[in-house]
Amino acid sequence: MKLIIFTGLILFAIVSLIEAQANNEKACLPQYQVCTDAPGNCCSNLVCDCYGRYKSGARIGRNCFCLLKGVIYKREN
């Protein structure tokens, strides 16, 4: 009986470790992908860069994208 309980606990621990490792290895977001809801999921060479959207001086939203680190994007007219 003790052996069955011990084996069950060991199997539970192994399954928990496998699930925890799978959660830590989520795929990262590539360049130009939306990261508004997941700012920490951009790939290592990218940063989640956000900007506000305005209409008639009032803020109407916020957009975030995975962009290259250190690159400055300017608006073209």
UniProtKB/Swiss-Prot annotation:
Protein name: U8-lycotoxin-Ls1j
Pfam families the record matches: Toxin_35 (PF10530)
Signal peptide interval: 1-20
Molecular function per GO: toxin activity
Residue ranges the record assigns to the propeptide: 21-26
Classification of source organism: Eukaryota, Metazoa, Ecdysozoa, Arthropoda, Chelicerata
Compartments, as annotated in UniProt: Secreted
Keyword tags: Disulfide bond, Secreted, Signal, Toxin
